[in-house]
Each structure stands twice: as C-alpha cells, then as structure tokens.
Amino acid sequence: MRQRTIVCPLIQNDGAYLLCKMADDRGVFPGQWAISGGGVEPGERIEEALRREIREELGEQLLLTEITPWTFSDDIRTKTYADGRKEEIYMIYLIFDCVSANREVKINEEFQDYAWVKPEDLVHYDLNVATRKTLRLKGLL
C-alpha cells in the first residue's frame, strides 16, 4: 500500500473558514465538502508543499498572513481517479491553522465550488469524515 503525506490548510478569514466541494468524479471524498490539501512531493519541504497546494488548488490571489502547524492524523483511504481507477492509500494528514488577508479564491478542477463558512453554519454542509473530525477537534462542530 502506498503512503502519502498530505498537507491541509484550515484557512480562516474574519471568522469564516474556507471549505471546498470536491469534484464528483475524483479524489478521496467525491462530491463532499472538505478543507483543501494535497500531497508532499519527493524532496519538497512541508511548508513549501502547503504553499504550492494552496496556489494550485485555490489560486495565486489568496494571501495567507499566518501559517501555524496545528495537528496531524492518519487513515487508510480509497482514492478515485478521474479515469475511474481506485487505489487504497495510507494517508498522514498534517493540518495547519492559516489566516488569510482576503477571500480571493480561484478553485482548480479538483473542486466544483467553495464557500467561506461561519462556525455556526458548518453543520449544514455535507462534510467528509476527515474534515468533520478536524473541525470537531478544533471545537468548531
């Protein structure tokens, strides 16, 4: 089984948290709401990977003013690829508290939508199990 280290920014701006709705045809949690994130590439430092993933998934315009390592978790997940292939992967999630100076987001093809969500409204979203666990640990659910 392949192992991946995943960096995940829990991004907050003015009391709201950034959630992204996964594409229906790919990823570990197709069609569900999640915090963004992605894999660390060979030879890449953790913070470099985090900043790269944010640029790739959320656009160059989103300006982070704070990045603080927060917690980690792990799990075995089944990833679905755009071509329909599936793969079981052992994932180690490194989660960061982040603050953004703006809300300028341009999502890539991995997502179909995004929203800035106040903590009291998080219960109204179909959150994937990993995001739900993270938000509970943070005291937001």
Swiss-Prot record:
Q: What's the cofactor?
A: Mg(2+)
Q: Which Gene3D superfamilies match?
A: Nucleoside Triphosphate Pyrophosphohydrolase
Q: Name one Pfam family in it.
A: NUDIX
Q: Where is the Nudix hydrolase domain?
A: 1-141
Q: Which GO terms describe its cellular component?
A: cytoplasm
This entry's Gene Ontology molecular function terms read: dCTP diphosphatase activity; dTTP diphosphatase activity; dUTP diphosphatase activity; hydrolase activity, acting on acid anhydrides, in phosphorus-containing anhydrides; magnesium ion binding
E.C. number? 3.6.1.9, 3.6.1.12, 3.6.1.-, 3.6.1.23
User: Motif (Nudix box) spans which residues?
Assistant: 38-59
Q: Source organism's superkingdom?
A: Bacteria
How is activity modulated by pH? Answer: Optimum pH is about 8.5.
Q: Which UniProt keywords apply?
A: Hydrolase, Magnesium
Catalytic reactions of this protein: a ribonucleoside 5'-triphosphate + H2O = a ribonucleoside 5'-phosphate + diphosphate + H(+); a 2'-deoxyribonucleoside 5'-triphosphate + H2O = a 2'-deoxyribonucleoside 5'-phosphate + diphosphate + H(+); dUTP + H2O = dUMP + diphosphate + H(+); dTTP + H2O = dTMP + diphosphate + H(+)
Could you tell me what this protein does? Catalyzes the hydrolysis of nucleoside triphosphates, with a preference for pyrimidine deoxynucleoside triphosphates (dUTP, dTTP and dCTP).
State the oligomer form and interacting partners: Monomer.
Family, similarity comment: Belongs to the Nudix hydrolase family. NudI subfamily.
Listed HAMAP family:
Nudix_NudI
User: What is the name of the protein in this document?
Assistant: Nucleoside triphosphatase NudI
Q: Which source organism?
A: Escherichia coli (strain K12)
Upper classification of the source organism reads:
Bacteria, Pseudomonadati, Pseudomonadota, Gammaproteobacteria, Enterobacterales
The coding gene here is: nudI
